[in-house]
């Protein structure tokens, strides 16, 4: 099957960075025997330095069509126009190569929907946005409903997101979660002396790293906390760490590639993230694939996969309960079977599992 995976919001091909979730799907489908190409639409503002126009290159063995049309926060209608211009340039580049997909599957945006309609190709869309975690205005809900109804299939990355999409638009989404790299994130243990918690996420308010630091400060004993990620709250969180006199026990490691994160998980005992909102929660899943039990909040995504066998679920913005959960984990870490936790994640989220589900979905769409 010829499949075009597409997504919005990318850095330049010079950095070889595209949306990791969508690229993971493209690679999994390629490995399943399909002819897969990738389309990247970049309509960020001119402030983001990058080449403009349409370029073709290869990333991890996947042919990529990258279209950059600077736009950013412009008046209503102009961003969609920029997206259409970018999509048109991608369509022309694909046609020049003499290749036509059987299915177009886009994440995060609808730029390639017009190409699908023009070429008579089924258009599949995956929703990731936390926009649905609150009630939408009638105008916004109607706008999204019209977009969804033009799709051959609409997917959501979690049950909670699908439920919220139904509440906002009445559209029934099919749940297909993100892929987790179960090769990089596999059970491995590195000996260490002190109990070690690890967390990973953008340093932004919704990840609630400040709440995690407050909860950690209330723990007894001398556990360690390692935080991976970068973002606008970095300075404030480091200042809070100093204020709470935690610098000897907390370390900030910044953004790092997957292999470094996996190595850190091998030397940790528990993953903890006190998010206020998640549509999926790939950070939790990666840690579990590495065999770590997790402490997660009931914030949308984790309810789909956190159980008594692999971790602890707590309410959002409840620092005292978070402290109690961390204390419980320190006392009862050996109750959790790392091999079983990892095996369950592999069964549900491995590349071959998700590729098989998507293949079945595409075949159903093409048979209609």
Outline where the language-model segments fall.
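Short alpha-helical donor nucleotide-sugar binding micro-motif in glycosyltransferases
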Residues: 255-256, 263-268
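Conserved acidic donor-binding segment of nucleotide-sugar-dependent glycosyltransferases
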Residues: 308, 312-319, 328-334
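Aromatic "clamp/platform" in nucleotide-sugar-dependent glycosyltransferases that forms part
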Residues: 276
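An aromatic- and histidine-rich active-site surface loop
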Residues: 14, 80-88, 103-120
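Short hydrophobic beta-strand element within catalytic cores of glycosyltransferases
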Residues: 293-296
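N-terminal subdomain of nucleotide-sugar transferases
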Residues: 1-53, 363
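Carbohydrate-associated surface elements
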Residues: 160, 179
